[in-house]
């Protein structure tokens, strides 16, 4: 079993001591330089994870699970535990069966989804489980329910604007991180113009434990569609609410200038970067793999690299087994030791060592 008791105890000790009146200290969970956390998306079974691992001869450090709003984490937790991976929880507001919208950005911002956010905080805090939480990824992709732009380029308006997306993101970060008394949390929410905690299933907790989570903000590097108001910066919630900046990059849309522009974005220039989804689809693309791995290695702020493996047999165009040359190339590239197979529990949790004392001038 990969869970390491000593490290988990250290995390729990940090979390227990973090509850107070102020907001929880952000945890980046960044690996030591120059390491990159290699990951794969969750296909729903441990067997599929193991098959992916065998295919590439590389154990992924991360397992990214896509969940609709309100979903229980019990089954996902078992997969994370059995595979020895650190979780990446990607949260959607669309039903995964019929794609209907479960909750709007405005409703989240105003507290209609607080029961679920409290559930997430409690889940990760009680277990002392380090995780990356990726709420409402790709807000500038028109097909997502939480986007602000229609596919014809017009504004959705109403409950679906960039303003409400940013407010929803801030509320998610504040509650899921925890580490505050109820009074402190409500003060934080009021500071950004949002109503107090709104638990409907029982009374509000007197305090929220600090959860060892890192919040990932992840738009597309260029808008879909590419129109005014639909670029990454339009959806930036602010550095206070973001621990990682991430983006997705697929062989079907290899717009390298957008990826380069995202990397140098001024608003998130101080954040570690994640490739939260990447994949090959439609045809064998070994050249794309070589380019993307080389780009990742050459850009030191990129510290996470997650392959999107798709869902379902037969119609899954992201299945690497369809692309033997791509698979062979990726297998070779992942031999680099800097692509981590396991996530260390204490990575990014503890403050850096203090700087050495300044040198004093020698007496003459």
What is the meaning of each model-derived region?
Residues 1-26:
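Secretory targeting and sorting signals
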